[in-house]
């Protein structure tokens, strides 16, 4: 059942009908006279254009005024346009806003816009002045007499001087009211009723004997501005659906409202004038579409939302402004319905404005933010609402710049695996540029011992590839560059050339096959090449040779240097392929057992290379010569260290052999109970034993001396256990003897403290190659 609302408040006196001017019965009054500034247009009641108004069941019934019999038939009736315009002031956001009917929407495609005179509200003051002259009869003393006519609502309302004075002060009506507090429409009615916003004390359904058109009520500033207080007695009208009370129907391309609230399209091309009709229930219901307030403050788009719902009867009317709903009920978007997406919009209130997104301010209210925004919905046959985004991907009305069709998208360029420059081809088995090709060739053939000034993690790219040759060479090896790959390529190319001469014979005789080398050199980087890259750099001791030497100063300096060398050894061990796969406890255990092995063997290698094993080269700035060896407590320890360098000199150990032997010394001592990842440890150790054999074969070639040399090198590895035992014994003694006052670095002191109980208890297991 359609709800109907009136303006008649109970408990107010009825305006006498004697003050109203008589008018002809059946005439239709133009309510837009004041808004348009023109004279009223009178249409006879028998006009064919009003024929549908007498049919209650018509789909396009117009709202007209039918005067009941015996109601001031000879009195001239005043114009009602001023009262309607004042009532419509609630929906006037600005002076440029159009108010009712088809004037409310912006001109759409194929629709001519209204003249500027229809939207000029400055004519309102002139209309008020003319109404003042026409309503001068209201000062007659007869206007105070009670009306003797029927109790039906009157067709006009007088004006007082106080009311006219208030209108001169506020000629625009109630345009300053907030549109946010207005309830736009219920769920069962698609039109908007502005009368339900008036806060009256009672429902008109209880008392209909008084006139709803009270001049003192219409002239009250607060009556149109006050929101619905949500009282227990809502404005409900008791009636049935067959009563002659239909909402305003909009023709043309605007959606029409059916009885059930659905929208339909009208084929009529006539623009009807909004009209008022006297109802049978002695009250007037004025229905009008909603009005959206358009701001004048530049390109500012304010998205409003509401936090309340108007409860009418047992249904909840959800308020939705700009697509934001405040309840879970049906949601309206003014011009569109979720069930009717194929029809044209009623309003196109916000045309696309080509401005940047930084000029748009969105005022988000307390609505449901999860619902679809009005600006994001797209329907066929309508222009999409612009949200002001300047990005072509966000705004559908902004076309993206045309793509250059002449530039063909070719394959991406191939990059060098070392410096990421554009690769020139496959060099030494790896896709590299010409610069890295030449660098790798010179680095390998020149046997340069590059040292990194940083932490062996320099960035190698096109710009910074020449800053650190050590890291660049390491990256070349990691990429898989190998000089043997070039030789293999030449061999394969020569074999292919020789096989082309006998290609026909090969095709005729399937038993023939292309000759392929039995064994190709390994193109991937070997373990020895990786060990070369991760080898720690030489450290300086910082020893002052200008000061006279002493055992205490030399020993303290050696301990400080040893602490830094231990840190470098930890980094080196973690970079060894396969070592980090061991359990973390096993890694720490191996480092604690082998730190003296690594330092002593590296010292022997430096002494062998730099002084042919005659002096101990701890650092470039600290070399222990024969004179320094004569100091107290120095000779016995230096004698054990010179043994290592002398053996390396005697065997003429190569650099590859030295690297493999040094790695095996890291894996030469374990606890008696074994390691947590013992199987993996045995596999890694066997791998580097084989690498030592490969290094021997590479040095000696396919000779019968390979096994003899392997025996000699492994015998040297076994002898390192005795050398390290003597060195550790002296180290533990100086660490425990506080009278010597020899300083130890923190990390080295921690390792010694943890290692002393294990050696004293004999909880060590030596991994020897030969039985004694």
UniProtKB/Swiss-Prot annotation:
Residues 1-22, 39-82, 132-186, 494-513 are annotated as: Disordered. Residues 482-518 are annotated as: Hinge. Residues 519-753 form the NR LBD domain. A zinc finger (NR C4-type) spans 416-436, 452-476. Keywords: Acetylation, Chromatin regulator, Chromosome, Cytoplasm, Cytoskeleton, DNA-binding, Isopeptide bond, Lipid-binding, Metal-binding, Methylation, Mitochondrion, Nucleus, Phosphoprotein, Receptor, Steroid-binding, Transcription, Transcription regulation, Ubl conjugation, Zinc, Zinc-finger. The modification N6-acetyllysine is found at residues 475, 487, 489-490. Residues 527-692 are annotated as: Interaction with CRY1. Its main location: cytoplasm. One of its GO terms (molecular function) is nuclear receptor activity. It comes from the Eukaryota. The modification Phosphoserine is found at residues 47, 115, 136, 143, 203, 211, 226, 307, 400. Residues 1-415 are annotated as: Modulating. There is a cross-link at residues 258, 277, 293 (Glycyl lysine isopeptide (Lys-Gly) (interchain with G-Cter in SUMO2)). Residues 480-772 are annotated as: Interaction with CLOCK. Pfam families: GCR, Hormone_recep, zf-C4. GO terms for cellular component: centrosome; chromosome; cytoplasm; mitochondrion; nuclear speck; nucleus; spindle. It is found in: Cytoplasm; Nucleus; Mitochondrion; Cytoplasm, Cytoskeleton, Spindle. Residues 1-15, 158-170 have a biased composition (Basic and acidic residues). Residues 499-513 have a biased composition (Polar residues). The keyword Acetylation applies. Residues 416-481 bind DNA. Acetylation by CLOCK reduces its binding to glucocorticoid response elements and its transcriptional activity. Increased proteasome-mediated degradation in response to glucocorticoids. Heteromultimeric cytoplasmic complex with HSP90AA1, HSPA1A/HSPA1B, and FKBP5 or another immunophilin such as PPID, STIP1, or the immunophilin homolog PPP5C. Upon ligand binding FKBP5 dissociates from the complex and FKBP4 takes its place, thereby linking the complex to dynein and mediating transport to the nucleus, where the complex dissociates. Probably forms a complex composed of chaperones HSP90 and HSP70, co-chaperones CDC37, PPP5C, TSC1 and client protein TSC2, CDK4, AKT, RAF1 and NR3C1; this complex does not contain co-chaperones STIP1/HOP and PTGES3/p23. Directly interacts with UNC45A. Receptor for glucocorticoids (GC). Has a dual mode of action: as a transcription factor that binds to glucocorticoid response elements (GRE), both for nuclear and mitochondrial DNA, and as a modulator of other transcription factors. Affects inflammatory responses, cellular proliferation and differentiation in target tissues. Involved in chromatin remodeling. Plays a role in rapid mRNA degradation by binding to the 5' UTR of target mRNAs and interacting with PNRC2 in a ligand-dependent manner which recruits the RNA helicase UPF1 and the mRNA-decapping enzyme DCP1A, leading to RNA decay. Belongs to the nuclear hormone receptor family. NR3 subfamily. This is Glucocorticoid receptor. The lineage of its organism: Eukaryota, Metazoa, Chordata, Craniata, Vertebrata. The gene is NR3C1.
